[in-house]
Amino acid sequence: MSVRHSGIGMTSLRTRVRMVERLREQGIKDEVVLAAMGFIPRHLFVEAALASRAYEDVALPINYGQTISSPWIVGRMTELLRNGGSNSLRKILEIGTGCGYQTAVLAKIASEVYSIERIGPLLTRTRIRLRELGILNIHLKHADGMRGLPEAGLFDGIMMTAVIPEIPETLLEQLAMGGRMVFPKGNRKQYLCVIDHTTEGFVETILDEVMFVPILPGTINR
């Protein structure tokens, strides 16, 4: 099915290619990640008024006080989750579906993606968008992301797209042995972090300084 904002569909492939080239120059090296981002039309995940800026390396506002992360952040977090291809990503949990762009990228690198969003109307719009794009290996859930999705079993990768001061134990318990979690951590100062589940326990590594909206508890229905 063809889905596009009027006036930019013919240039979207060219601008995606340029975006991928820029990401490569900025240090994103995983060709699987770059191919996924080159395939997913980012302009379909932003508001129509901002569609002309969709391929700029900036975060853009979406509805309900949320943002779509910059392409570099999406590439960086996805590359970290894949860990150079050493992490077999059969099943991923994403906490914070938002507009669904990161979700769609994850769906290109994993067999199954489970994604949780606390804002009901935002999730409804995202569900329609992903269905129109024919992305069928995503399971969306309207719920409080702080508890994860224990009923779905263990995950090879977990990604959180909002900042949190500390990871709850309940989320660590959902990370499979050998799995990796990628998330922003902090308060006023925020850092991109990874947690690897190893035979010696959970090992945390602090990486880049970043800026994300905070994770919030509970759900919103309207």
From Swiss-Prot:
Domain of life: Bacteria
Localization: Cytoplasm
Keywords tagged on the record: Cytoplasm, Methyltransferase, S-adenosyl-L-methionine, Transferase
Enzyme Commission code: 2.1.1.77
Gene Ontology MF annotations: protein-L-isoaspartate (D-aspartate) O-methyltransferase activity
Active-site feature positions: 69
Endpoints of the signal sequence: none
Entry's family note: Belongs to the methyltransferase superfamily. L-isoaspartyl/D-aspartyl protein methyltransferase family.
Protein name in UniProt: Protein-L-isoaspartate O-methyltransferase
Species this chain originates from: Nitrosomonas europaea (strain ATCC 19718 / CIP 103999 / KCTC 2705 / NBRC 14298)
